Every structure is written in C-alpha cells, then in structure tokens.
C-alpha cells in the first residue's frame, strides 16, 4: 500500500486513522488480492505459503485441511494445490488466494475484479463465499465491472 496524498478528508480502517505512523497496524488487518497475481512462483504450494511466511502473518497457522475446506466452498479441486502455477487458470489462482485470505482471518478482504475470469457458477460460489466471510465478521471490499456480481453485494458504490 503506497500513499497518494489526500487533498481533503481522512481514511479510517476500523477505528484506526490511516497515516504513515499507522500503516503497519492497518496492513495487519487487510488481506489484499489483486486481479492478476504476478508472483514468480513455479508451484501453487509456494504461492499459497507466501502469505504465511510474511512477518505479519507468522503467528497464523497453516492447515492443508482448512485450505481444502475453502477449496470445496469455492469449487476448486484439491489437486490444484500440487500443480504448477502455469497449469492453473487466472480464475483458479484468484479463488486459491481467496481461500488463503480466509485462512488469514483478517477483518478486511480487498479484492480487485474477483469474477473477471469466472463463469456464472463460479461467480455464484465466490459471492456465497464472501457472504460467509461477512457472517464471520469480515468486511469484503471488491472492485468489479460485473454488474451481476455487484447486484449480489450488500452495498454498491458506482463511480
């Protein structure tokens, strides 16, 4: 997360005002999933392990069993975990990282274009997954051009 100077107003995440002194506190509260995962990994297993190796997440235990539970919710085959990254579609990669974000148990999940590479059935599973995360107390902020997906969200802001 970089800074774009504000011309007016403030940004708060939870009760924390965003500024240079609080950025690390806020980063600990957010799971971020970009539209395109430009990570230099050969194996999905390595891609999944990265967030758990980061300093801010080292206290979060990794569980293959929990990962597979989330895979099931998102319509992903378990064997994806042992494949090469280049054998996995963009939509599958994004859903894999959604599963990882849920495992990190952050209060805020930010995701860019979560349905851009998905069919209608997978889109429905992702939307249902977001709803379950919200029921568990997480907020999900998604940027999307998919009007069908957006119509299933609790709040919609059009820009």
Where are the predicted features?
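Conserved ABC transporter NBD signature motif
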Residues: 6-18, 26
